[in-house]
């Protein structure tokens, strides 16, 4: 379908399932021959396909049984989201790619000066997510920031007040020891948000485009928003400095698009 430029969402569920069966007819025997060629000892007379009726029915039955037993629930949690395939990707399906990136050090102004301090500096590899920041975390053991816990920050560009809070997840040795917290777009931030009752704000839609409500940034892709937000911080005199930073990013095993940690409604076991 991808080679033909056809989206599964455009053709609908029934035609998509038909296409899956067509693919199976075209390639199923080749896959079985490859497995046999590797010397795998299988009962080839009792072959099952993921979408075989008896197999699919068994999965549905187990799902319903677990649901009625209270073992399955629907909730909004962080998932690995592919904005190209528009689907959640399991951890073991994600591929990691090393990337030469940057650490942007951004100045976040305090709502009111504290002991002569007018702002804190946060380090981030993803400045585009700051639109959804709902807090700044510091280590409870970090003497530099203990006096700031409970104070608030006026979030640049967006303008909302967000709290400074203490959480043991924070590594005071990384960056500045102040961590911008975006619960809807980072699994660790999500966990901190749960512990500290932070608001969850999705700033991207299912295609990783900035949603409405963010002025000129709305409608931008992740990369476009990153560039524009960094430029805005620089124009405001709030870009402290930038460092080179190599890190790994998760990509989709199907299309190799960078995955987006995204707050989504899914079924969980």
Regions found by a protein language model. Name each.
Residues 1-3, 89-91, 139-140, 217-220:
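Short secondary-structure boundary/capping segments
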Residues 1-68, 192, 221-239:
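N-terminal Rossmann-like or analogous alpha/beta NTP/dinucleotide-binding catalytic cores
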Residues 8-15, 171-175, 209:
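Gly-rich Lys/Arg/Thr-decorated short loops/hinges at beta-loop-alpha junctions or inter-strand turns
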Residues 37, 41-42, 48, 52-207, ...:
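NTP-handling and nucleic-acid-processing catalytic cores
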